[in-house]
């Protein structure tokens, strides 16, 4: 039996700017199916910019390079098309949507994905039976389904709601942008357990984080350290421990060597 992995994402010399300021200065990254990659780096290094560009945020302009998602040019797709194709972004600060119940929002997103796959839409009752199972992944009470999207949710509840969306949509590529930000240890553990349950040999996950503590619960296959819009170093899980001890200052010397 072949164990060859499928290439999910290939980023080649990606350059990007926002409001005329260059942020990404040549990012290269390859991710295969079944892999978890963590991107770490100091504030302002370009980590969150990279995640938003993958999702198609209109404020960021790609000025060079290419992004291939399952061998297709991701940059040619609108944000909604990327989502339907299997790219999922969990925001650092999930937005609130007044007047839209969580279950209606989730069913719309789920049925849009089904349509993309040529499947029929699910009626509310059938969908409820599916989403009820997924609630167990993130230990959420069913009453959250009837509340407006993220409205009045705590920070931990918002992050768990994002992972619930991920569980339903089963994306090929999930990008978790500082999902650990603002979480206490119990909420972090619940979110991490949910992510670990959803990780499988068919999908890929990018964890973007500033701190090592998330990686105590979700062990990545690769860690990439970003500084000044470039990936300067790649290693295994041990690299996060090195960063915890050394901090990020040593990257300045490494960057000088690579220039």
Curated annotation (Swiss-Prot):
A Pfam family recorded for this sequence: ABC_tran
Record-linked InterPro entries: AAA+_ATPase, ABC_transporter-like_ATP-bd, ABC_transporter-like_CS, FeS-cluster_ATPase_SufC, P-loop_NTPase
UniProt binding sites for ATP: 41-48
GO MF assignments: ATP binding; ATP hydrolysis activity
Annotated ranges, domain ABC transporter: 9-253
Family indicated by similarity: Belongs to the ABC transporter superfamily. Ycf16 family.
Name used for this protein in its record: Probable ATP-dependent transporter ycf16
Organism: Cyanophora paradoxa
């Amino acid at each position: 039996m072949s164990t060859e992995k499928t290439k999910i994402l290939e980023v080649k010399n990606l350059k990007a700017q926002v409001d005329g300021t260059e942020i990404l200065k040549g990012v290269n990254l390859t991710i295969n199916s079944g892999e978890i990659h963590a991107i770490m780096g100091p504030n302002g290094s370009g980590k969150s910019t990279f995640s938003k560009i993958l999702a198609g945020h209109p404020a960021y302009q790609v000025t060079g390079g290419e992004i291939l998602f399952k061998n297709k040019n991701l940059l040619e797709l609108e944000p909604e098309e990327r989502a339907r194709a299997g790219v999922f972004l969990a925001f650092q600060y999930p937005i609130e949507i007044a007047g839209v119940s969580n279950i209606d929002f989730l069913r719309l997103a789920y049925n849009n994905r089904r349509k993309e796959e040529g499947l029929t839409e699910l009626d509310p009752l059938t969908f409820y039976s599916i989403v009820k199972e997924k609630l167990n992944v993130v230990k959420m009470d069913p009453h959250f389904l009837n509340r407006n999207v993220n409205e009045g949710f705590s920070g931990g509840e918002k992050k768990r709601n994002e992972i619930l969306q991920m569980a339903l949509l089963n994306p090929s590529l999930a990008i978790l942008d500082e999902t650990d930000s603002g979480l206490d240890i119990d909420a972090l553990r619940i979110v991490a357990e949910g992510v670990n349950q959803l990780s499988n040999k068919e999908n890929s996950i990018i964890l973007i984080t500033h701190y090592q503590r998330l990686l105590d619960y979700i062990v990545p296959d690769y860690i990439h350290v970003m500084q000044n819009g470039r990936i300067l170093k790649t290693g295994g899980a041990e690299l996060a421990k090195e960063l915890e001890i050394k901090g990020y200052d040593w990257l300045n010397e490494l960057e000088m060597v690579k220039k």
